[in-house]
């Protein structure tokens, strides 16, 4: 069926509600809009669903959410796991509570109990809830840091991590097999509750989740000594982090926490920012203003679903605030956690620091310094979660810390997704620890550069929307795959990792070996002097991302090298546009 026929079927089928049909009636005659909304089903990929909210098969709406949930329910029943139920959380976005209930009622109609949070909660708490409740799966309604018009649907498995093989492909196949939207099961909320298939959760998960975070604290003595002297500015960017971040900091004894008032309350419009992303400087405008006003030591921002943390720290010498990238904050927290664990308890022989392939090589230097394993995984925190599960199942490997360059880390194993609530807590604890040594977090960062090397990493991306954009993204990857650059920015390419073909090719010797990781459409160029470039299509946005890293002899040298390599990458992009 073509897009026009699908459009007509939605427009005329009484199964679809009046508001949906009115929205579709309003685009009658607009061929481009009709095609964009109906040329495909919103793809249920390895990250679940993510798309613009609206009527149509290629949009986020109650019908696409029901379809995805019916596919998930079919898979759960297929593997005989329906007795354990599914936990459901949601963020502050438009339609998030409605989508959560639609998912719950579809599960209930399939005989699967849904545990639904009473109000918005952070992503990592959903991961924790799946484990705590012993659920088969979890659903999180969120589009993370995407613009306001987006929403999404992420699926977790029983270990609390987002779905990985074989469950991801199994669920994707079942979702694809649901072709008739009107055949999807649902039931009234009151009946689901009466039948014991819809249960509200809240404080019964919040309290043990916060307790698990507090178990991670290594130096309560330092917090007790100097917490009253530390000034912390925090913004939840209109999202889910407000209550849990403030709660855990307060319970530990941090009394000077200033919340950005304009961004404190949940709001799906994200009215103070165009893009609620803690990677973006714009997201910190209000936080920085408040930070300067109260003379804050550090400024924290969590994204709407509170799994990623952005940070600015004060330089006591100049009074300026420095932005920490996800690589910098991840290494700062990781070095603190691993270093203090070694000092207090010693490190296990099989201890491991896990990072994604696009994260900084400083992590490798930290692991080498402490004599622990550095393990690389594909991009996506689910692969870090998968590694923790592997450690538990084999009895080989002890998880110490995991991080991604995209501002996410996990300092414990209570959950299996990145946790900005825990990261905020650990960073504040680290600030207290270093303060007892007369150091700031910026001083600690400079000391890490001295110890491990001056690593500088960056990422740039090109956005290519719609049908044409999808084709262009594939064209770019094909061009690079067929014509690998011999050098980029003066750095000679010494090896090419093609994760789609599962090959690492030494460019000088021509020797080929496997990557050892699952296949993925990613190209990675190892280069001279420790430089590297990695190219991959985003799994959640219509973008191609270009990551790069260098190592310098000083901060200034690393900055200059990074800037030069970034220019070379942009020049490479220009040749393909």
Q: What is each stretch, according to the model?
A:
Residues 5-103, 192-229, 240:
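An N-terminal, well-structured beta->alpha segment
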Residues 33-38, 42, 151-285, 289-290:
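Gly/Ser/Thr-enriched, mixed-charge loops and adjacent short helices
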Residues 38-58, 143-146, 232, 236-248, ...:
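Conserved phosphate/anionic-ligand binding catalytic regions in large, soluble enzymes, centered on
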Residues 85-91, 231-234, 410, 549:
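Short glycine-rich or small-residue beta-strand-to-loop segments that form or flank ligand, phosphate
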Residues 87-150, 253-310:
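N-terminal small/polar loop signature for handling phosphorylated ligands or for N-terminal nucleophile
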Residues 99-107, 150-157, 307-327, 363-366:
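Short Gly/Thr/Asp-enriched flexible loops that form oxyanion-binding sites at enzyme active sites
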Residues 156-186, 327-350, 355-363, 420:
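Glycine-rich phosphate-binding loop plus the immediately following alpha-helix
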Residues 292, 296-298, 320-322, 340-536, ...:
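Phosphate-binding and adjacent anionic-ligand microenvironments
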